[in-house]
Amino acid sequence: MDTFPSLFPPGGDSRLNPEPEFQNMLIDERVRCEHHKHNYQALKIEHKRLQEEYVKSQNELKRVLIEKQASQEKFQLLLEDLRGELVEKARDIEKMKLQVLTPQKLELVKAQLQQELEAPMRERFRTLDEEVERYRAEYNKLRYEYTFLKSEFEHQKEEFTRVSEEEKMKYKSEVARLEKDKEELHNQLLSVDPTRDSKRMEQLVREKTHLLQKLKSLEAEVAELRAEKENSGAQVENVQRIQVRQLAEMQATLRSLEAEKQSAKLQAERLEKELQSSNEQNTCLISKLHRADREISTLASEVKELKHANKLEITDIKLEAARAKSELERERNKIQSELDGLQSDNEILKSTVEHHKALLVEKDRELIRKVQAAKEEGYQKLMVLQDEKLELENRLSDLEKMKVERDVWRQSEKEQCEEKLRASQMAEEAARRELQSTRLKLQQQIVNTEKAEKEKLENSELKQQISHLQIQVTSLTQSENDLLNSNHMLKDMVERLKQECRNLRSQAEKAQLDVEKTLEEKQIQWLEEKHKLHERITDREEKYNQAKEKLQRAATAQKKRKSLHENKLKRLQEKVEVLEAKKEELETENQVLNRQNVPFEEYTRLQKRLKDIQRRHNEFRSLILVPNMPPTASISPANFQSAVTVPGAELSFPPHLQEEQHQRELSLLRKRLEELETTQRKQLEELGSPGE
């Protein structure tokens, strides 16, 4: 509004100004407006270009941040790999330390070797002692059984002799008594009435039936005796089997003892091999110790080289950091001087520059404080830049509004607007240049700050690595000293172990010699015992063979006797049958004679026949009663002739004499049966004693 008086003359009369001048002024004003429009369009295009450049710069910032993150991740991976390698090396060192033999481990190895060497030998000696005690117990048991059986045999022998003598005395007394009875019977028969012969015949028939029953009972007893004989043979076979089994067991024990001797020899050889293997293991451990010493020396040289390289890298990094700091300070001073020299009209650009400075200061502080919060700050910067972009767009819209208002005002203030527009154009061009320069400087500052941050991080990481390496170097030096000390100790222990191994070898050789001596002594004892056992076995076999021969002889004799007895029994049965038939004929003849008168010739013939029958009957009785004695006729033909007075009269004995004779015969048969039983028992006892 203040510029209007300068446009019009002071007189104030519009009539004085002609119309063509006014039209010219309007034309000029229109030209200026068009020129302003063209400028506005150019500014708009420039604004779009600046926005695109801003977007590009943001994209570049993102890319740079991504590259920074990738580089950080790579460095972290490298650090982790290096740490893993250090951990593995530390583990290897610990393993080597564990593999190194300490005096305690050597003592444990010694104890284990002693246990492994002594335990099987102790067990072997213990088993041998147990077997020796077991064999002694068995030998004592067999000796006790032998003495017991011997005493029983002697006792049975004495009893047998006593019983045999008693039975001999009995038999002698009975024979004497029987002879007396025989004489008495002979006298009685001479004094007996011949009329009682018929009763005597009946009594003889009864006796015959009784004798047949006795024969049957005797046959049953003979069958029982056969069964007993078979049982005795089975017992003898069982005894023989038991002896064979005992022989096999003794042979098996001898074989087992020989096998144990061989196993003891093999065990001694195995112990020698184990000693050789232990010596080889000691040599291997010594070689491993030398290798460990070499590796430790190589590791120490590598550690020294790493120390030197780290020192050089640290010095290089320090120099580069000092150069970067000086360059950054110079650039900051330049930027501050350039920012101070900017015009006061462009307040928007100043506010953005101040805001960027504040952001840079905050970014520097936050990077110094927190290295790990770089990502968050980058995102915050992006948000701040987006906010700034919005603010710039709002300000540009405000500027456009102001331009519209100014266009309205410029219609009245043409000259002032032209001057201001020119000044603003110049200022805008200068501002654009300054903005471009500031943007380039900001980008350089951002890159420099990122480089500085990277360098700081690398410096911190390198410092940490250096500290870790120093710790490792100290630990390695300590481990080297420990290993050297342990090597000296190990050498001493190896020498001691060698001496102990020599002592152990000498002790083992002595023990082996002692064991061999004991084994030889035991072998000699076992051979003596074996020889004794063989002698005992041969004696037993001889006794057994003798007993077997005796049994066979007795069996053959028994068979012969049995066959003889059977033949005699058959003959006697035939004779008895013949006598029965003759007796029946005589009875019929007697009946006929009793019914009719018999002539003298027939009577004499019948009398002779009766005498013959009586003689045969007496022979049969004598054979039954005393089979070994020759048959004797107790009644002579003269006695019979004198005894016979009446023809047709029956021959008979008194009843009390018949009963006594029958009882005597029964007693004789019982005695004979008892004698057979005693003889068979004696034979069985004789067979049983050598079998046992």
From Swiss-Prot:
<keyword id="KW-0970">Cilium biogenesis/degradation</keyword>
<dbReference type="GO" id="GO:0071539">
    <property type="term" value="P:protein localization to centrosome"/>
</dbReference>
<keyword id="KW-0206">Cytoskeleton</keyword>
<dbReference type="GO" id="GO:0005794">
    <property type="term" value="C:Golgi apparatus"/>
</dbReference>
<dbReference type="GO" id="GO:0060271">
    <property type="term" value="P:cilium assembly"/>
</dbReference>
<dbReference type="GO" id="GO:0048278">
    <property type="term" value="P:vesicle docking"/>
</dbReference>
<keyword id="KW-0597">Phosphoprotein</keyword>
<feature type="coiled-coil region">
    <location>
        <begin position="32"/>
        <end position="625"/>
    </location>
</feature>
<dbReference type="GO" id="GO:0005814">
    <property type="term" value="C:centriole"/>
</dbReference>
<keyword id="KW-0175">Coiled coil</keyword>
<comment type="similarity">
    <text>Belongs to the CEP83 family.</text>
</comment>
<dbReference type="GO" id="GO:0051660">
    <property type="term" value="P:establishment of centrosome localization"/>
</dbReference>
<dbReference type="GO" id="GO:0097539">
    <property type="term" value="C:ciliary transition fiber"/>
</dbReference>
<feature type="coiled-coil region">
    <location>
        <begin position="656"/>
        <end position="689"/>
    </location>
</feature>
<comment type="subunit">
    <text>Interacts with CEP164 and IFT20.</text>
</comment>
<feature type="modified residue" description="Phosphoserine">
    <location>
        <position position="689"/>
    </location>
</feature>
<keyword id="KW-0963">Cytoplasm</keyword>
<protein>
    <recommendedName>
        <fullName>Centrosomal protein of 83 kDa</fullName>
    </recommendedName>
</protein>
<dbReference type="InterPro" id="IPR052116">
    <property type="entry name" value="Centro_Cilium_Assembly"/>
</dbReference>
<comment type="function">
    <text>Component of the distal appendage region of the centriole involved in the initiation of primary cilium assembly. May collaborate with IFT20 in the trafficking of ciliary membrane proteins from the Golgi complex to the cilium during the initiation of primary cilium assembly.</text>
</comment>
